[in-house]
UniProtKB/Swiss-Prot annotation:
This is Mitochondrial enolase superfamily member 1. The gene is ENOSF1. One of its GO terms (biological process) is amino acid catabolic process. Its main location: mitochondrion. The modification Phosphoserine is found at residue 148.
Amino acid sequence: MVRGRIFRLSVRDVRFPTSLGGHGSDAMHTDPDYSAAYVVIETDAEDGIKGCGITFTLGKGTEVVVCAVNALAHHVLNKDLKDIVGDFRGFYRQLTSDGQPRWIGPEKGVVHLATAAVLNAVWDLWAKQEGKPVWKLLVDMDPRTLVSCIDFRYITDVLTEEDALEILQKGQVGKKEREKQMLAQGYPAYTTSCAWLGYSDDTLKQLCAQALKDGWTRFKVKVGADLQDDVRRCQIIRDMIGLEKTLMMDANQRWDVPEAVEWMSKLAKFKPLWIEEPTSPDDILGHATISKALVPLGIGIATGEQCHNRVIFKQLLQAKALQFLQIDSCRLGSVNENLSVLLMAKKFEIPVCPHAGGVGLCELVQHLIIFDYISVSASLENRMCEYVDHLHEHFKYPVMIQRASYMPPKDPGYSTEMKEESVKKHQYPDGEVWKKLLAAQEN
């Protein structure tokens, strides 16, 4: 039962120095420090349950997201949780329509990252109070309640409330069987952990060999900085995994449109399933042009991790600009906005393969994609969820991978709660880890 009035919202800048090991490095982001604006909301309920939410960043700039969270905090404080979730669409609209901070969005950029962090904390709190993981909270909701969580503004030309309700009602058929399947087998995953751009060939080979031993069959390699380097690294991986296993490529927005087509034409011999983020995430027509050129070569287009909002996804789908849609649990406006994108993807019959490279993203997005299979898509064809083997040890309820699949979380909440010791050690700039690193830089 939903209970309590929110009386406190705190937000901290938490950073992990992943750049020291080249983890997360790609053609555009060469030295990321995986980071998060970490939000905790507390209520006056006697149970003492806290809601925890994050949005993912790469180090510098996290302090700006923290400021944006604080600018939105008044929308949450002194609100009864039952009033928020009882009119979740209205609350989402309130957060995203605040006239002054909206000007530095709207529904994109720093202010939308902050919105995601706040809403992720609300979903975590709600699910904890209900005693369910978020995926189960969603699966158990009746279709009308799910639809009531979604803001359909700007997407009714593609998805109306009636469309969404029809999709969800159809998804009720076979739902119990699919839930049992997920609990037994998990949701298929792919690994990005082997082939960050900053890794040496020896590291790449070592990690790839270990991944094969661990049962991984789907691999992603970062490309885009140097063509000959890409050819060499892709050859190493393809030789190791063989042609029977799946290979994807990710350029992280490095190329112009003609360059993307030319570059990928030269990498086509390695038989990638997709090229991810070949150009600017805002260039819908550019993605459509690249798609038209590469699909005949057997290469699909995947994008979405830096798509600002549901409107960009709507246009990508309308323009036939992608073959694989990549939601992000912290870029979009939390569960609410992701629901609208999952439903649009279903309407266009485009598989959803979430982005999960980053601190806490695996923990969050597993809930969304498991719900998608059970209640929306009812398909695993050409579907998989990214997995990155970094920083899970800092979470109270870390993701569980078995047989290269995400096993559905059983603990209540959104799996967003971090260990307090980890937060204190990695808080920027006053945590123990950063005091040492910053002192060393000064010397």
